[in-house]
């Protein structure tokens, strides 16, 4: 289907990387959109072309209700009253992913989930390129999809957040994957977790091949499931599964052994699942199995994702700053094997999530919890006997450096958004690395 944007009043919401990519997309088509940002001083303001009309400081602007088409950046909630009013007036509101999907003719692999998206998307990009594809990776991983549009591409790998899926309606994926679904971004969704889950599930609606995590008990009745192929991973009854009868779990497809985890650099069940689903995607794309296995054997963790920064004098320091929800902290704790004390750095903006699921884990572990940031005091009350409140990350690391002993593991796995004290999780992780080098 061909879309004609000429003669339409087009408005872009947000001056982040996504917003800038949308401006450039329309300018290449000879169309001048307008743009609004909620901030009075957006960091990317200098990137706005001089001939583009803009408004700063608030979304409550007449341009919204005068528009024919609004392209909304993922950081802006779709549930703002003025946007609800715009929809009621019949104004079309879409994401940059929707714009992208209208332009692409080659296969798309869409990857979403609460945790693990960037890791799996990067694995698949490497496997695809090794298999001879001209593959491009973009989306939530940090490169807007409109920036990777290429007429010579023969495959796109797209990492998708729930925010990006909210206003995406015509994404026709060759393969769609939901890695996992657990509580996150509850403060974004008026109807809570089920609304967040349903948004994630929408990635399957127009997909050809749907890869599902059997542990999440996906309700297929909620998905437009006509003419779809379903592939499962996770449990013992899944197509792709992990056999854990030995010290080194083995990855299987059906009853056939694929890979022994002793042969790979990554460790922890969350990483074994990431490799498992990458194998499922690779097989569905008919990438040569040997290419996939060779890439996965040599793959190491991405920065800020259970990244071992230092292992000296019997003490391991692990940077898992990408942990921005409860489930990711739970997974990180379950991946640690130590005879000493786990010293967990937990805190930031909890996004109204329920952290009580960590109670039982804390009770069974030899652990000391250092709670910091905006919700640090609240988090310290989950397991008061093992917790201490510290104002910020720096003070927490200084305190830990005085208490740590040989055999201990220091884990930054905050389980929270970083935006209360940092620009993003990368800045938080980089500070942690800097402090380790300076203090320990």
UniProtKB/Swiss-Prot annotation:
Pathway: Cell wall biogenesis; peptidoglycan biosynthesis. This is UDP-N-acetylmuramoylalanine--D-glutamate ligase. It comes from the Bacteria. It is found in: Cytoplasm. Belongs to the MurCDEF family. It catalyses: UDP-N-acetyl-alpha-D-muramoyl-L-alanine + D-glutamate + ATP = UDP-N-acetyl-alpha-D-muramoyl-L-alanyl-D-glutamate + ADP + phosphate + H(+). The keyword Signal does not apply. One of its GO terms (cellular component) is cytoplasm. Keywords: ATP-binding, Cell cycle, Cell division, Cell shape, Cell wall biogenesis/degradation, Cytoplasm, Ligase, Nucleotide-binding, Peptidoglycan synthesis.
């Amino acid at each position: 289907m061909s879309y004609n944007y000429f003669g339409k009043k087009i408005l872009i919401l947000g001056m982040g990387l996504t917003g800038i990519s949308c401006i450039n997309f329309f300018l290449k088509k000879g169309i001048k959109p307008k743009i609004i940002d909620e901030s009075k001083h957006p960091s990317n303001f200098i990137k706005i072309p001089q001939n583009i009309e803009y408004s700063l400081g608030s979304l409550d602007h007449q341009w919204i209700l005068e528009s024919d088409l609004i392209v909304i950046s993922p950081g802006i909630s779709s549930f703002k009253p003025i946007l609800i009013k715009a929809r009621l007036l019949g104004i079309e509101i879409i994401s940059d992913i929707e714009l992208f999907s209208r332009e692409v003719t080659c296969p798309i692999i869409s990857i979403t989930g609460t945790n693990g998206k960037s890791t799996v998307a990067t694995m698949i990009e490497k496997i695809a390129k090794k298999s001879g594809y001209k593959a491009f990776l973009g989306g939530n991983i940090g490169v807007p999809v409109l920036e990777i549009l290429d007429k010579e591409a023969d495959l796109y790998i797209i990492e998708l957040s729930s925010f990006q899926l909210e206003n995406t309606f015509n994404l026709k994926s060759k393969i769609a994957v939901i890695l996992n679904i657990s509580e996150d971004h509850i403060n974004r969704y008026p109807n809570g977790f089920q609304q967040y889950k349903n948004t994630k599930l929408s990635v399957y609606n127009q997909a050809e091949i749907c890869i599902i995590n059997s542990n999440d008990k996906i309700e297929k009745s909620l998905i437009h499931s006509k003419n779809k192929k379903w592939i499962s991973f996770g449990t013992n009854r899944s197509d792709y599964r992990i056999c854990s009868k030995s010290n080194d779990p083995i990855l299987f497809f059906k009853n056939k052994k694929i890979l022994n985890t002793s042969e790979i650099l990554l460790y922890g069940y969350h990483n074994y699942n990431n490799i498992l689903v990458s194998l499922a995607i690779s097989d569905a794309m008919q990438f040569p199995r040997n290419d996939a296995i060779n890439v996965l054997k040599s793959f190491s963790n991405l920065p800020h994702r259970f990244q071992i920064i230092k292992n000296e004098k019997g003490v391991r320091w692990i940077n898992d700053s990408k942990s921005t929800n409860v489930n990711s902290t739970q997974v990180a704790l379950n991946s640690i094997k130590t005879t000493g004390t786990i010293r967990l750095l937990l805190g930031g903006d909890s996004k109204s999530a329920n952290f009580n699921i960590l109670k039982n884990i804390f009770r069974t572990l030899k652990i000391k919890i250092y709670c910091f940031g905006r919700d640090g005091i609240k988090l310290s009350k989950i397991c008061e006997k093992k917790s201490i409140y510290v104002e910020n990350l720096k003070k927490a690391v200084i305190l830990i450096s005085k208490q740590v002993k040989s055999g201990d593991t220091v884990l930054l796995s905050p389980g929270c958004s970083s935006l209360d004290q940092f620009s993003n999780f990368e800045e938080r992780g980089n500070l942690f690395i800097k402090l380790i080098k300076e203090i320990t």
